[in-house]
């Protein structure tokens, strides 16, 4: 079946291997609420990787070589074009320079979409460079001193602010520190970073909207888990993804095959 590729997903369950063959789906949904309950209504879902070979079979392919990270930004912007100004909440995999570059280009015509995501624990941001008091030769500095954000949980522990926030259906007491810094090699886009401590965990959240309240950023990211519930219901209640992409009539897959090897198909 077209689009099947070797995938990797971290797993702490011994019955689920980290490497497997399958389709890579990308989906977006709209978070709605009824009273205190929140739900994710699916809007779009498609295969976002592994279609290069099938597209070569036809002329005038409509599928470009953009990564699934960029495709997700485009899908979010299309939804925002229908619903109006929106926030796209993504996991930490999507904090990349190509994603932010695509977001900047799409928002040039009409600013409809902002992204809320999570940064890796090893994330490094940069201070905003200070203007020189006296003019100097050469171009102005694009970035200031680098900051390892993970070290701020201890170095600036006294600057954290406490707040009560609704997370995962219940009130949680969290501590947060909000900073506007530059991020991205050669991009140096100004982003809002929110360092969060709750229970025995910590996280670094990011927003492209510099005016958004840090508490709202934390609450919005907590709603991201609702799309995981949508995938679960789609599979268990409707039977989505319940298909086989292999058959005995097909030759066995050579797991050691290289890209330069000839195709096993006639």
Q: Model-derived features: where do they sit?
A:
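Active-site-proximal, Lys/Arg-enriched surface segment
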Residues: 1-49
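Single, function-defining residue in the core of a domain
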Residues: 35-266
């Amino acid at each position: 079946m077209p689009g099947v590729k070797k995938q990797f997903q971290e797993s702490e369950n011994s019955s689920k291997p980290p490497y497997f063959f399958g389709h890579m789906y990308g989906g977006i949904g709209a978070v709605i609420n009824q009273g205190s309950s929140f739900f994710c209504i699916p809007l779009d879902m498609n295969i976002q990787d592994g279609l290069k070979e099938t597209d070569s079979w036809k002329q005038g392919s409509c599928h470009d070589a953009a990564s699934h990270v960029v495709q997700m930004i485009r899908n979010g912007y299309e939804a925002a074009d229908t619903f109006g100004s929106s926030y796209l909440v993504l996991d930490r995999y999507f904090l990349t320079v190509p994603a932010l570059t695509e977001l900047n280009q799409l928002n040039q015509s009409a600013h409809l979409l902002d992204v809320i995501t999570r940064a890796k624990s090893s994330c490094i941001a940069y201070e905003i460079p200070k203007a020189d008091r006296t003019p100097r030769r050469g171009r102005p500095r694009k970035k200031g001193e680098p900051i390892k954000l993970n070290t701020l949980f201890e170095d600036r522990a006294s600057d954290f602010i406490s707040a009560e926030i609704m997370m995962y259906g219940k009130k949680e007491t969290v501590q947060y520190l909000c900073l506007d810094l530059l991020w991205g090699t050669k991009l140096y886009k100004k982003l809002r970073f929110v360092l969060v401590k709750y229970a025995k965990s910590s996280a670094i959240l990011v927003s492209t909207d510099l005016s958004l309240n840090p508490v709202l950023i934390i609450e919005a990211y907590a709603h991201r888990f609702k799309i995981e519930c949508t995938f679960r219901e789609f599979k268990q209640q409707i039977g989505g993804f319940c298909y086989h992409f292999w058959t005995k009539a097909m030759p066995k897959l050579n797991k050691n095959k290289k890209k330069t090897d000839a195709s096993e198909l006639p």
